[in-house]
UniProtKB/Swiss-Prot annotation:
UniProt entry keywords in alphabetical sequence: Glycosyltransferase, Transferase
Protein name: Putative thymidine phosphorylase
Family: Belongs to the thymidine/pyrimidine-nucleoside phosphorylase family. Type 2 subfamily.
InterPro entries per UniProt: Glycosyl_Trfase_fam3 (IPR000312), Glycosyl_Trfase_fam3_N_dom (IPR017459), Glycosyl_Trfase_fam3_N_dom_sf (IPR036320), Nuc_phospho_transferase (IPR035902), PYNP-like_C_sf (IPR036566), PYNP_C (IPR013102), Pyrmidine_PPase_CS (IPR017872), Thym_Pase_Put (IPR028579)
Species whose genome carries this gene: Hahella chejuensis (strain KCTC 2396)
GO cellular component, one term: cytosol
Length: 505
């Protein structure tokens, strides 16, 4: 009898969320661990009649698993497409040869195109453990990648994912580097640009550390989980879409690396550029506008860093054959009023519907970005883009196009707000002098956003605005009293993150 035929266990779903890391749970004294010499954190190949994955071993010492069972984390279960009681075979994995490039980078070697290809291929293939992934992320953190290394990493990321060919040019796109709550211009921009005859198939992300991503916000108004075939049908019909990028495998290695970056709380200039540009190239974009908000509590805190980031993006775009342009914007305070999926969607609709109460700052930002894209795309002359965008918005053409896109994606619905609300008011007379973007984002998340799409924070004031005692500053919306209580506890513990100063005479 072959060894493989002995090394089998029956699979059991145990309902543990390991944050996308495939983990297999085995009795320490089961026959497979003993015969193969598996230890805690061993990397093993798990094979069924349908699929094969690599997972990390966690060993169990008590009786909640039998000696004949192997438990799978949610991530492993999903990747393996397993069924309860299904037979799986276990074996050692080969050493990951590309780790030599990671070690080399840690000791000062450069990342070549060949080494980047090997590392990224293994990352996307699930060969790296979280420890090995952390080593690679650390090796590339900060400003440790030069422009050619960034371009090599970006190219490698594109190679391991799907790449969409729309069969025409130009294909317009935009991206915001983030860090600014409420800056949800994308649905407005897509509506304006496509209403003017350009193609803009927008794949957007869900929130990672923010209270809402564009996909989360759009999902409160229309379905966003589109297959590639569905995306192409919507774009063919309407000229654009606003879909969740995770539903098509555009840059699978990037999704893995982002998870590790967030866990380590590491910002990598090079990996940020590679992440953005790889997904734009894979999405088939030819002309990309990057929105870089600058502010002391935004992701990008200085004009110098913004310019360096923009330079990296332009250089990498040229290397990969797309046109990239950057636009620097004000990141001193949240944009619009709503922070959280449904609240941001409400602001978007107010702008598209030309309502009097629509947030002026969100409207101006969207018109500025859309106007520049119209110029880049050749449907407006230089300097005339904003006027063309404004005309498209005010005529109702942008709203009509947005509704058509929603219907093509599965149907439009009005976003709903959470039932529990607390209104924070000013405790003094003065002028709003400071708003901490990170505090506002954390407050919205504690209220339940983005998992509860109707939760979040609704701002009533802007920097420089005069307020009186008792005047509303912002409202917190939550689905449950407990979530509202979490947010209020945080608010009480951080009293100076929104400051009011006496007006100078």
């Amino acid at each position: 009898m072959q060894q493989r035929e002995l090394n089998y266990l029956f699979l059991k779903r145990i309902g543990i969320n390991t944050h996308q890391e495939p983990v297999v749970y085995m009795r320490q004294d089961c026959h497979v661990c003993r015969s193969e010499g598996f230890n805690a954190h061993s990397r093993v190949r798990v094979t069924t009649n349908k699929r094969s994955i690599i997972a990390t071993v966690h060993q169990v010492t008590d009786g909640w698993l039998s000696h004949q069972e192997a438990g799978l984390s949610d991530a492993a279960w999903r990747l393996l497409e397993a069924e309860d009681g299904e037979v799986a075979y276990f074996s050692h994995t080969k050493a990951v040869d590309s780790m030599s490039h990671v070690r080399g980078k840690l000791y000062g070697a450069s990342l070549t195109q060949e080494s980047a290809d090997e590392v990224v291929k293994d990352v996307a293939g699930g060969l790296y453990s979280d420890v090995q992934l952390a080593a690679f992320v650390t090796a590339c953190a900060g400003s440790r990648l030069n422009q050619d290394e960034v371009a090599a990493l970006t190219s490698a990321m594109v190679k391991v994912g799907q790449r969409i060919d729309w069969g025409t040019s130009p294909i317009m796109d935009k991206h915001c580097v983030g860090g600014l709550p409420g800056n949800r211009t994308t649905p407005i921009v897509v509506a304006i640009v496509t209403a003017c005859g350009l193609r803009m198939p927008k794949t957007s992300s869900r929130a990672i550390t923010s209270p809402a991503g564009t996909a989360d916000t759009m999902e409160t108004m229309a379905p966003v989980n589109l297959t590639l075939a569905q995306m192409k049908k919507v774009v063919e019909q309407e000229g654009g879409c606003i879909a969740w990028g995770g539903s098509v495998s555009l840059s699978p290695a990037d999704d893995v690396l982002i998870r590790i970056e967030r866990a380590l709380d590491l910002d990598s200039e090079g990996q940020l550029v590679a992440s953005v540009i790889s997904k734009k190239v894979a999405a088939g974009s030819t002309h990309v506008l990057i929105d870089i908000p600058i502010g002391m509590t935004a992701k990008v805190r200085s004009p110098e860093y913004a310019e360096r980031l923009a330079s990296h993006m332009r250089y990498t775009g040229v290397k990969l054959g797309i046109q990239v342009e950057a636009m620097f914007t004000d990141g001193a305070q949240p944009v619009g009023r709503g922070i959280g999926p449904a609240l941001e969607a409400r602001d978007i609709l107010a702008v598209l519907r030309n309502q009097a109460e629509a947030p002026a700052d969100l409207r101006v930002r969207a018109l500025t970005l859309a106007g520049r894209l119209l110029e880049i795309g050749g449907v407006a002359s230089h300097g005339a883009g904003v006027a063309r965008a404004r005309e498209t918005l005010e005529s109702g053409a942008a709203l009509h196009k947005f509704m058509a896109i929603c219907e093509a994606q599965g149907g439009f619905r009005e976003p709903a707000l959470a039932p529990h609300c607390y209104e924070a008011t000013a405790d003094r007379v003065g002028v709003v002098s400071f708003v901490n973007n990170r505090f506002v984002a954390k407050l919205a998340k504690l209220a339940g956003a983005p998992s509860n799409s109707s939760a979040g924070v609704d701002f009533h004031v802007k920097l420089g605005q005069k307020v009186r005692v008792g005047e509303p500053l912002f409202s917190i919306y939550a689905e449950a009293p407990g979530e509202l209580a979490y947010a209020l506890d945080f608010l009480r513990d951080h009293p100076n993150e929104i400051r009011i100063e006496e007006e100078s005479l």
